[in-house]
């Protein structure tokens, strides 16, 4: 069983994406306006529940940093096999780092053609600064290459020269590998 929590209390979207009622959710539970049982909703997908963001509060960071938030997340971990929290953008506000600090792991979502290497490095450093374990990064919005080709990327995060963050990846594959593009530093030098 999996529960997805909309931790983006500034621009919540999960209710819309999953066809759920968004008026009562995480913010309401944290502020004492609803119980967790009242706020968790089933979705059309088997074994997937959602805790929508709820009413947009005036103080999202305070709510997310509260003991109530830690208790709710702990209660969810006891009820579900997996708890996935979708948060606000990491570099825009502190909300994501607050949630990440008490998580078992973080996947950093990066948008192809939009997220700069420096931004990714800064985001990872922000997570490390709060002690959040970075499990990896997911590259979204990658362009389609056509029906006759395929591509994939994989990589790992580590330390490069002089302690600089480094991301190692393979290049998109379309028939053959390009070994000369395997390693690229997050700092932008190639």
Spans of features found by a protein language model:
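P-loop NTP-binding module
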Residues: 1-190
